[in-house]
Amino acid sequence: MRNAFADALFEEIQKNKKIILLAGDIGNRLFDKIKKKFPKNFYNCGVAESNMTSVAAGLAKSKFKPVTYTITSFNTLKTIEQIKLDICYPNLPVIIVGVGSGLGYSNLGTTHHSLEDIGILSNIPNLNIVSPADKLETKILLKQVLKKKIPVYLRLGKKGEQDVYEKKCNSKFGKINQIKKGNKICIIGYGNVLRNAIDAYNEIKNIYKPSIYNVHTLIPLFCCHKYFLATLSILLDLKYF
């Protein structure tokens, strides 16, 4: 995923010079094309993730489109206060990219594990959370969120993930994407473990005919809005509150 992210970001910087990439002492070779062709669009902020996050907020206030990038555990939990106060409360258009999410960097020890990032960040107002399933969806969703004027947490795997989408990906920000259509069982997943759901589908498809849904955008989930309002209306009628 990280290579796909770097390629897609390079393409987008060619179109929009307001995009600024801030890296936390990682991805030096990964972003060689950006550094060589657009040296003013890349800054290595070093092992100072909290400062990098505040710098991104300042750039956003100055009409730039900042993207912060480093290992997920460092770009989320170590920077939680800056994400909340500097980016999300003012609702600034910063994209926070975490790479090697989950156990992507498991061999480097518990400091590099990120199993609780979604649970924690989902409680911060204004923060949108997107978790692509493979390299193609990473490119598609990155291009979409770069056009939006909102804070976004883009949760990536590391590398070598199996493809979910081989040639075409029609994922749209905020909307569930149906991958397989069935009629008895519904399998829901997201991120780089979605491939496991497809493997499970292949094992039971001749018996149960399951559907598979990719919830790549965890927040917001537009398809749930009308059902939330309907439920709220019923509760109000029942004087539940």
Predicted regions and their residues:
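Thiamine diphosphate
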Residues: M1-R155, G160, ...
